[in-house]
Amino acid sequence: GSKVTDFFNFKASEALDDDAIKVTLSTDSVNAITALRSGRDLQIFTTGAEFFVPQADLTPITPSNVTVKSATRRGSKLGLRPQAAEGGTLFMSKEGKALREMLFSDVELSYVANNISLLCSHMILDPQRMALRPGTDTTEGDLLLVVNGTSTTGYRAASTGFAGNIAAFMLNRPQQIVAASTFSTDG
């Protein structure tokens, strides 16, 4: 992170509370950071794993108290921003084949990343973008839209653009509902 009130100053110095934070993610492989999300904790998504910086009692993260913990070893797809939904974080797996929900587990005192598209992964074809529309009343859940790529030939073939196919997921965690469908447009 940068120095307080100096957003482009990432130079580490005396490790004062308002100094920049420099942390190395200790893993057995090189992992490029794909996204950051601030929620219950600071979540760090990489190509090979997910990490989090725990934040106890709403104390700010500083150079003297920063700790990075490993959450899961799934990896997230580059270019698709994770979405916050009902206390969890939805993200696409690094291969673009599974929609996962990163959720804190009180039993494990860490995050788990469950595959919520297990029964409908065939609807996700080369995902290009994701967007979430939160539910607006008590009779509907959150709606996650995943824009698929151009190629529908073969099993998840690589593509270069958008052909008009969208995978839609209605999510309602309290009722344990994940309802998936597809929308087709003219492109």
Where are these regions (language model features)?
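Beta-propeller domains
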Residues: 1-21, 51-63
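Beta-sheet-dominated scaffold domains
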Residues: 24-187
